Amino acid sequence: TMLGPVQKAWLKRELKASIAPFKVIAAGGGWSSAENEDGGDSWGVYLTERNEIFDFIRDEAIEGVVLISGDSHMGELNCIPRSGQGGYDLYDLCSSPLAQMPAAKHTRQTPEMRVRDTWTRTVNVGVMHFRMRGDTPTLSYTLHDVLGEAVWEPLVLTPDDLKNGVRSWDRLADPLELERLERFKQGKGYYGYDPGPDWPNRPYYDAE
């Protein structure tokens, strides 16, 4: 278990009680299945418990949940599609490192869905901007490089994107990432070349 029964009960209770349009759950390690190496410390190693939390969010109709994480040694913007299972698509906003060298390990990884290409050129920081005035609150997320420049087009979410039955991942993903996903679904390498025999086995995650 990643959380243990006391922390998990607290998390579920606070999520259910919150009336905020956006509810941010922060974790030290990534939420996607990408980093599921043996002995790892991300949620990719604790998928049963992770999915229990995601099922709770769906079953209790808790809207507006967004995930943030770090410690992947590269900038990422991933999605765990849950709309095909009666929930909604959960976005993992991941920035790192800030004080170490980045690691180009993305070629060995395939999360459920990449929304933007990984950033491994420089240290980086993620910036979340909430606009709560007006009729439609928005959350925007961008990743910035060592010079403070944005490296992606921002991801912009509204509360309507984060409610049961709403599918948004393919609408918000970069076309390049959708192309890579289609290639992966056909049994080919996600990044255009076949994985090595010693690479972790990560079958296509069917978001339908």
Model-found features: residue ranges?
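Long, structured stretches of catalytic cores involved in phosphate-ester chemistry, encompassing
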Residues: T1-A207
